[in-house]
């Protein structure tokens, strides 16, 4: 996987529910880091099962029905756990993990259909 863009060519990066689909997410993160300029920032959203300490992935699971049963969707390759932010840090990013929905009451979360997903804001250090 190589993104056909020059190094340090973007100020902002948004990745919304992509990394769970790619074969080598760490390499993809490395590419995101490479194309983001120093001081640039991004939002990297993925489904994270906060009840899991560690990400679960098994490349031997290729059957779509089995992937759906295990990962929740036929085209997912992993289930991220609470270590997701750590994966982003391993790529070199500074990471802020924001539990956005926590600022709302249970009633407000229901009324506005706010998911329990966290927001991961990354920054490439200067």
What name fits each language-model region?
Residues 11-23:
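A short SAM/SAH-binding and catalytic strip from SAM-dependent methyltransferases
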Residues 2-13:
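A short acidic, Gly/Pro-enriched loop at the edge of an enzyme's catalytic core
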Residues 1-2, 50:
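Class I SAM-dependent methyltransferase SAM/SAH-binding core
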Residues 23-126:
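S-adenosyl-L-methionine-dependent methyltransferase catalytic module, highlighting the catalytic core
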């Amino acid at each position: 996987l190589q993104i056909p863009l020059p190094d340090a060519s973007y100020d902002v990066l948004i990745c919304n529910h992509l990394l769970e689909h790619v074969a080598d997410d760490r390499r993809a993160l490395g590419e995101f880091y490479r194309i983001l300029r120093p001081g640039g920032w991004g939002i990297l959203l993925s489904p994270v099962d906060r009840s899991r300490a560690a990400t679960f992935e098994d490349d031997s699971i290729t059957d779509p029905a089995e992937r759906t049963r295990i990962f929740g969707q036929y085209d997912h390759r992993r289930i991220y756990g609470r270590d997701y932010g750590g994966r982003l840090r391993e790529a070199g990013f500074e990471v802020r993990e924001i539990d956005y929905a926590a600022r709302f009451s249970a009633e407000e979360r229901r009324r506005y259909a706010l998911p329990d997903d966290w927001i991961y804001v990354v920054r490439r250090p200067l």
